[in-house]
Amino acid sequence: MGGLRRRSLLAAAGGTAAAAGLTSTGPSPAQAVPRAAAAGATEAPVPSGRRPGPYDRKVDALLARMTLEEKLGQLQQLPWAYDTGPGGPGTKAVEEAARAGRLGSVLSIFGARTCNALQRIAVEESRLGIPLLFGLDVIHGFWTTFPIPLAQAASFDPQVAARDAEVSAREARSNGVHWTFAPMMDVTHEPRWGRIAEGNGEDPYLTAAFAAAKVRGYQGDRLSAGDRIAACAKHFVAYGGAEGGRDYNTVDVSESRLRNLYLPPFKAALDAGAATVMAAFNTIGGVPAHANPHTLTDLLRREWGFDGMVVSDWNGVQELIPHGVAEDGADAARLALNAGVDMEMTSTHLVTHGRRLLREGRISARRVDDAVARVLRLKFALGLFAHPYADEDGAIGAPSAKSRAAARAAASRSMVLLKNDRGVLPLARSVGSLAVVGPFGDSTDLLGTWVMPPAAEKFPAGTVLDAVRRAAPGSTVRHARGVAPQGDDTSGIPAAVAAAEACEVTVVVVGEPPALSGEAAARSDIGLPGAQRQLVEAVAGTGKPFVVVLVNGRPLTVADWVERAPAVLVAWHPGIEAGPALADVLFGAVNPGGKLPVSFPRSAGQIPVHYNHENTGRPYSPDDKYTSKYLDLPDGPQFPFGHGLSYTTFRTGAPELSTGRIAVGALREGDTVEVAATVTNTGSRPGDEVVQLYVHDRVASIAQPVRRLRGFRRVALAPGKSRTVRFRLAAADLGFWSNDPHGEFRLEPGAIDLYVGGSSAADQKATLTLT
């Protein structure tokens, strides 16, 4: 989503009042390798055979009354306000377009009164009275800011995402918003990419589970309900594969990787009912996603049967020109519409050039009607024709106690304990003295990327310092920032060291400011910014116990100091209840149970490093130089996918299978294999363990990842208690997509190793033979 949208909210604010995831989500076969869209190419045919829908008669009747200009207007989305950047006519022109019936949607608008004023123009002053569709980036909260999506994935509990979406939808819909541009489900192996904060990490299975949960949370059972909003599956597709982690960059991906890595979360989101899809900024094989009929039409429409609306990303149609595939705006409009884009965000090429393109035969009236029908069906589904206005008296203007409690629980459930040497954590509430140091110790800038500016201003995050003081009221709590979030000034470090030396234990709160993650926030160096590393080393030099709390929007490189830190807790950007949630974990009211949804690399030069890499012909060996490795780094990440400790300990037994052999034909007919594993709390505290199931196909027709996540379950156990966790493996979990141009799914005979445990390094193993 374009970075201009966040800035636009600042102007818009002035007018406002205020355990799923265990089933396979593999997509169906498709020809998804893109072919170049030649300048003279005809449109991608409109998919046929669509099932009749409940609003078809109403939509057809409305289409019959609409002029061409009104139809093209329904395909236009304009921003309500903005300050700089390309495109966008300003609020007066938006009102004029609504009055003329030449506008379908408005983004970056919220507030019941503001939305109603604009909606009245469309409904009461335009010829046909077609209501507007109001969209907003409700990514991880509206008023109640939850942890960033990457943090939520660390909970390994999709209900965390569902609860975020439910709260967000209720608050947003009451303020006039109908549609969110979320969830983002771009799998990535690139921690340098800033938008990793908006997604769910490096694994397609985990991402698919969270994508589906969030769609269900936003949309519920009925879009027309007064507390639900339409979801948008973005960015279609492979945006997370941007070269070098630089945003908007090129993606070059094989058919197999596209289908095995990038597509499963989208299929899961659509199976969960996602109403819309957003095209991606990147190219795939040289073809921009906004002009790619093979992903937007052949795969999305024909194979998967998606009948919803596809929206461009911010200025995505216009950007076909600098991509070098469109000569001008008319050509860009032609390419996008014919590829499968239904609504143009920000730029205005379809509404400007549509009549000429039709006259010249470069687009068809049928394709225009198809796109308009998708827009109108969504408006009917949302109930906008019957109830176009928000209830101004019922608009939610602040987080509730209940929503804050949900955000607090989500934040603590998402935190990951990387290490805890000598049992430094949890802290005793009776500790005599405690220091809080670091640039984020007293900071409210802990909400994360993509936060609505009025929410950040009115409802900032609770600070760690305040929460620690409340949690340990009898303790002497000292504070010193030491250093700023960015910059090389170390003059404050002596004060921080003095505070640490004077106290029994120190909490060092360091990390990234939210501005360093998110869109257009790629970093070549993903270590602690500025002088923060020097602060950690200085505190370590005191010899006193200390804990490092990381607040971050991506994995960080920590190799240069982590061995000196007795305990490290990853808090991510935790949202509105940051301080209280951190205090809950630091003092043991909550036992951390989160797991890493993405690997932490040893250095930026090691990227990409991820658990689900493929075999090579020369696997790593520490004793053989001529194997796949770096000469100056140990093999593997600093902390692997799925890693996370607890204040207690767990033991997971070997997996037990319902059968050790199963025929490929039986799997294709729907048979499954049950995998059971018993986990025991072997420590002295109650706690949560995430039991994870991985598979590896030993010999296949194309090289397979060394491990693939195929199940997870978060379980709570009292000390000494055990529980047997059961998973079911189906054909989709045991096969893979080949590089066949038609997207062939293969399920081949042979041995498949199964691993269960508490991380991707799980060593409890069994073998299943496919015959």
Regions found by a protein language model. Give the residues of each.
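N-terminal export signals
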Residues: G2, S8-P27
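Short beta-strand elements
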Residues: A762-T771
